[in-house]
């Protein structure tokens, strides 16, 4: 019987994944981010991998659903919970051995959810300078927070430039779901 590849825990509790695994899963996350961009969503894609199997995946669905909480990580968490239910598996056992691969640093909301779900390792692309929950704005990942589970490890910077370029492309385009501006522009009268 072939052993399944996956995250390995060191004696100090640190998790690690191979470069090959990281490349494989981050490529799929990047494809999901591109799909989000093609659908006028903020280009973030992620995968939750347990025992070398994708148990949850997501891309941003905020504009599509008109629900500000439908970030890629939240969509993936919902899918992983469904995966556990369908297989009669304990979510806590699965999540404690699941690695999340995501193209952009999780926001504060998503980092808090990942911590509550006890995800041990998050591999991400670029930093989220506005809302980052893994150290860019707040450090939900490793802060001493009561009743929130164990801190999780972060491996930042994987294909960061590519993730930033997708974000730039998104923010250059018009968002058809954005509310209309209520600011009145003064007309210039030339004499």
From Swiss-Prot:
The keyword tRNA processing applies. It holds the Pfam family MafB19-deam. Coiled coil: none annotated. GO terms for molecular function: tRNA-specific adenosine-34 deaminase activity; zinc ion binding. Disulfide bonds: none annotated. Belongs to the cytidine and deoxycytidylate deaminase family. ADAT2 subfamily. Probably participates in deamination of adenosine-34 to inosine in many tRNAs. PANTHER family: CYTOSINE DEAMINASE FAMILY MEMBER, TRNA-SPECIFIC ADENOSINE DEAMINASE 2. This is tRNA-specific adenosine deaminase 2. It comes from Bos taurus.
């Amino acid at each position: 019987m072939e052993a399944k590849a996956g995250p390995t825990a060191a004696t100090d509790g640190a998790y690690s994944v191979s470069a090959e695994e990281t490349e494989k899963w981050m490529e799929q996350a990047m494809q999901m981010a591109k799909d989000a961009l093609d659908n006028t969503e903020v280009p973030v894609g992620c995968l939750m991998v347990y025992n070398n199997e994708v148990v949850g995946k997501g891309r941003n669905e905020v504009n599509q659903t008109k629900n500000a909480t439908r970030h890629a990580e939240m969509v993936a968490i919902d899918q992983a919970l469904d995966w556990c239910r369908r297989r009669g598996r304990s979510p806590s056992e699965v999540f404690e051995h699941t690695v999340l691969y995501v193209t952009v640093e999780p926001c504060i909301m998503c980092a808090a959810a990942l911590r509550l779900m006890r995800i041990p390792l998050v591999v991400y692309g670029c930093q989220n300078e506005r809302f980052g929950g893994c150290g860019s704005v707040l450090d939900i990942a490793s802060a001493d927070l009561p009743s929130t589970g164990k801190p999780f490890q972060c491996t930042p910077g994987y294909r960061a430039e590519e993730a930033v370029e997708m974000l730039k492309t998104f923010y250059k385009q018009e968002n058809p779901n954005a509310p209309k501006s209520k600011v009145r522009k003064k007309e210039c009268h030339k004499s």
